[in-house]
Every structure is written in C-alpha cells, then in structure tokens.
C-alpha cells in the first residue's frame, strides 16, 4: 500500500512539473542603451561581426571605425572586470588562442 501511495505522489508531482517548465515566463532582458547613457558622438556601439576574429585585427577595425575609442582592452574570457561605463573603452574578451569570444561593445 505504501509503494502505491509513493507512485501516486510521484505521478502527481510529475504532472505539476511539466506545465511549469513548458510555459513561457516572458522575462525581458534589460539592455544598456549606450546612446542614452551619456556617450556623445558614438557612431557604433557593438561589433558582432568580429566574433571569432583575432584580437589584433578586431582592435584595428574598432579603432578605425570609431577613433574616439582610445582604450581598447584585450581580456581573457572570464577574467575580472569593473562594471563602470566608459565611453572611450571597448573590451575584447578572447580565448587562449587570442580570438574574440564575446561581442565587443562600448563600456
């Protein structure tokens, strides 16, 4: 009798879990809009086309497209960074082979 009660309890719990995982939670991700954050004269804020490229090549492209960016940093992916916003800085997150692994953006 105890085993039957466990089976029934398991089936009831399993029927509750499936609808919880299948529903859309409608979570909106907030994006920082650089143009509204006080960065005047910014012509381009993100470079998704540079994913997978060598860091030196990406650095040249970014500085050519926006000369106001005087601080282009190469950082190993997962390394510590500050959370402050700087309009003249772009961080290039690279892997051990020095290829871009995250979309470079102003910040």
Curated annotation (Swiss-Prot):
The record marks 83-84 as: Reactive bond. InterPro entries: Prot_inh_pot1 (IPR000864), Prot_inh_pot1_sf (IPR036354). Residues 1-22 form the signal peptide. Keywords: Protease inhibitor, Secreted, Serine protease inhibitor, Signal. The keyword tRNA-binding does not apply. GO terms for molecular function: serine-type endopeptidase inhibitor activity. Its main location: secreted. Residues 23-36 form a propeptide. It is found in: Secreted. GO terms for cellular component: extracellular region. One of its GO terms (biological process) is response to wounding. Induction: By tobacco mosaic virus infection, wounding, UV light, salicylic acid and ethylene. Pfam families: potato_inhibit (PF00280). Belongs to the protease inhibitor I13 (potato type I serine protease inhibitor) family. This is Proteinase inhibitor I-A. It comes from Nicotiana tabacum (Common tobacco).
């Amino acid at each position: 009798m105890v085993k039957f009660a466990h089976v029934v309890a398991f089936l009831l719990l399993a029927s509750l879990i499936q609808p919880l995982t299948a529903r859309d939670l409608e979570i909106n991700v907030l994006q920082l809009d650089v143009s509204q954050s006080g960065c005047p004269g910014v012509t381009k804020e993100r470079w998704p086309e540079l994913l997978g490229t060598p860091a030196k090549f990406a650095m040249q492209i970014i500085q050519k497209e926006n000369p106001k960016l005087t601080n282009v940093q190469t950082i190993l992916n997962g390394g510590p960074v500050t959370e402050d916003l700087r309009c003249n800085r772009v961080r290039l997150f690279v892997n051990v082979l020095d290829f871009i692994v995250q979309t470079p953006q102003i910040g």
